[in-house]
Each structure stands twice: as C-alpha cells, then as structure tokens.
C-alpha cells in the first residue's frame, strides 16, 4: 500500500485518495474486508474510493463526527455512479 496516492476532489464537495496506477492499464487491486468477509477486485481508483468510504464510516461512527458523515455520503453518492459501483459496494457492505 505504499507508493504515491493522489487526492481527488468532487463537484459535490467530497474527496478521496487513490493510489497512482502503475503503467499497466489493467492493474487491479484485491481488497478483503474482514468485517463482512467480502472480497472484491477493482481498479486503483475504485480501491481508493472503497478505502476512503470505510475510513470515513469508521471515524463517523467511532467519533460521532458529523463532518465525517457528510464526507462519507458525498463520496458514496459519487461511488454509486462509478463504473465499479458493484465492487465498491460489495467491499464496504
């Protein structure tokens, strides 16, 4: 999980970070969520979205932080329109 991560801002005020892809256009990341037992294979961008959604959700619940809740739903709205929506939702479910 090292390397360079890029920050993306969304038109709706949301934001996420994603690992910079290698030169290989077909690069995929395999994520496993031990909390729900789900596994998904996705692009670096989708992996970043999923990782940020899980992080925002964790902090929103644990810290009862309204700002994190807002960030979560802004990014989730974006993720629902993403071409890899199914994989993202499977891993965060």
Predicted regions and their residues:
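Polybasic, proline/glycine-rich intrinsically disordered low-complexity segments
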Residues: 24-93
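Amphipathic, interaction-prone secondary-structure segments
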Residues: 1-26
